[in-house]
From Swiss-Prot:
Designated name of the protein: Squalene monooxygenase SE2
Cofactor field: FAD
Subcellular location: Membrane
Gene: SQE2
Record field: transmembrane: 12-32, 475-495, 500-520
Annotated GO biological process: response to jasmonic acid; sterol biosynthetic process; terpene biosynthetic process
Induction trigger: Repressed by methyl jasmonate (MeJA). Accumulates in the presence of squalene.
One Pfam family recorded for the sequence: SE
């Protein structure tokens, strides 16, 4: 009897424990459901998923594979633009001028202090004029640029832009990047159909493979919000966290820039950028205001000496300063001593997009090249002109799949201009860098002497660099003309087996520089775009109701 009572008590305890466990589990599920509903009312729950090896914040609507029709129907925007840098601000103004309702979301709307994006080539200025934004270089103390001066081994030569056929106002411009962007933001925000908001976009909202909008943290960073539009254009710059879902990013960092400002001194060649072919890599000087000269020292590799422990200052004084033109030496040392040294990795990334309905990439988020030639803004503004012209015939952007197919033509139409500037930047950087290889040394010397010849030998390359004549065949011709000129210098007047071998290595080295870049850009799209079917895409026809 005792044993039986003990078993009965144990059974009762077990049943009570099981009932308590079941009640706790039901209570947990009920609480979890209430929390989820509360978060959805506030703007949606968030979670993390891995896309292409990178973490991406996704909304509950993305996780469930849909966003409600009410959310989309409730939006009055035609286009969402992520980022209000050069590309984003110019695009917002351009699309709004065409009557689109534009919502711009920018991480930081205060004026930035950057060491790149400070030189706009004449070709880029012409695109500004075409977009109606040329007045944005006014009232920021921007300086006109009429060409470049090259220095190497105590020699120098001046290369002027071929501006004779253009209006007197056409020239390059150099300025503080932050001032220029603020002017463009102000101009875009002055239009009644542009809404510019400070916030951090964390993800794209997708439904069945179509981008419907974005989720973002508001200015205070506490609340999540969502914005919806038929077309989302991502222009969030070189540090883009959204590009992974819209392209295959293959980012290379060949070098870093170390930035200094020299004050109250003029450059030896007024209104010209200065490029010193130093060892191990180039040094740039150009004016960014009436009293300031920007100096950019290229340091190969992904790391620079430490600023904190003085290694970088020591490197600049001992390795770089002796190669600076004498006229700038004292100001260069003074700028180092002042201590306001900034660094920036130089990225390059060929454009390799995924055609995604409802979304598009632009600017440095989409395509980057070495900043040596200052071509980035020219490419971005040229792309914006193309996008504007492609979208102009369209009244409605809601048919995402049809719009996506139509906009595939953009990727082909942009190639001749963008690929020429990209290839020139990558090739010129490699040619201008010092090398222990004798053939590479000969190529570098030949390039300097070829540009010093004048006539077509200087006007052709500088027209390419300026963005005034961005033709792939012209680039190809001049690049190999430099190589052949180098071989000719070796073989004349008395060729020898050693010189012939060196000449062969020079041609081989030149091919090894340019052909991989052309391959990454796409040979067919770059040189023969008219053979690509997307080149001929016509605007979709809107059916009448």
């Amino acid at each position: 009897m005792e044993l039986e009572r003990s078993y009965r008590e144990n059974d009762e305890y077990f049943l009570m424990f099981a009932a308590t466990l079941l009640f706790g589990f039901v209570l947990y599920l009920f609480t979890l459901r209430r929390r989820r509903r509360r978060r959805e009312k506030k703007g949606g729950a968030g979670s993390m998923e891995i896309i292409n090896g990178a973490y991406k914040m996704t909304s509950s609507s993305e996780v469930n594979g849909h966003c409600t029709p009410e959310d989309i129907a409730g939006s009055s925007d035609d286009v969402i633009i992520v980022g209000a840098g050069v590309a984003g601000s110019a695009l917002a103004y351009t699309l709004a001028k065409d009557g689109r309702r534009v919502h711009v979301i920018e991480r930081d709307l205060t004026e930035q202090d950057r060491i790149v994006g400070e030189l706009l080539q004449p070709g880029g200025y012409l695109k500004l004029v075409e977009l109606g934004l040329e007045d944005c270089v006014n009232e920021i103390d921007a300086q006109r640029v009429f060409g470049y001066a090259l220095y190497m081994d105590g020699k120098n030569t001046r290369l002027s832009y071929p501006l004779e056929k253009f209006h007197a106002d056409v020239a390059g411009r150099s300025f503080h990047n932050g001032r220029f962007i603020q002017r463009m933001r102000e101009k875009a925000a002055s239009l009644p159909n542009v809404r510019m908001e400070q916030g951090t976009v964390t993800s794209l909202v997708e439904q069945k493979g179509t981008v419907k909008g974005v989720r973002y943290k508001t200015k205070n960073g506490q609340e999540m919000s969502a914005a919806y539009a038929p077309l989302t254009i991502v222009c969030d710059g070189c540090f883009s966290n959204l590009r992974h879902s819209l392209c295959n990013p293959k980012v290379d960092v060949p070098s870093c820039f170390v930035g200094l400002i020299l004050e109250n001194i003029d450059l030896p060649h007024i209104n010209h950028g200065h490029v010193i072919l130093a060892d191990p890599s180039p040094i740039l000087f150009y004016k960014i205001s009436s009293t300031e000269i920007r100096c950019l020292v290229d340091v190969p590799g992904q790391k620079v000496p430490s600023i904190a422990n003085g290694e970088l200052a020591h490197y600049l004084k001992t390795s770089v300063a002796p190669q600076i033109p004498p006229e700038l030496y004292k100001s260069f040392i003074a700028a180092i001593d002042k201590g306001k040294i900034k660094t920036m990795p130089n990225r390059s990334m060929p454009a390799d997009p995924h055609s995604t309905p409802g979304a598009l990439l632009l600017g440095d988020a989409f395509n980057m090249r070495h900043p040596l030639t200052g071509g980035g803004m020219t490419v971005a503004l040229s792309d914006i002109v193309l996008i504007r012209d492609l979208l102009r015939p369209l009244r409605d952007l809601h048919d995402s799949s049809t719009l996506c197919k139509y906009l595939e033509s953009f990727y082909t139409l942009r190639k001749p201009v963008a690929s020429t500037i990209n290839t020139l930047a990558g090739a010129l950087y490699k040619v201008f860098c010092a090398s222990p290889d004798k053939a590479r040394q000969e190529m570098r010397d030949a390039c300097f002497d070829y540009l010093s010849l004048g006539g077509i030998c200087s006007e052709g390359p500088i027209a390419l660099l300026s963005g005034l004549n961005p033709r792939p065949m012209s680039l190809f011709f001049h690049f190999f003309a430099v190589a052949i000129y180098g071989v000719g210098r070796l073989l004349i007047p008395f060729p020898s087996p050693r010189k012939m071998w060196l000449g062969a290595r020079l041609i081989s080295g030149a091919s090894g520089i340019i052909f991989p870049i052309i391959k990454s850009e796409g040979v067919r799209q770059m040189f023969f775009p008219a053979t690509v079917p997307a080149y001929y895409r016509a605007p979709p026809i809107t059916k009448k109701m």
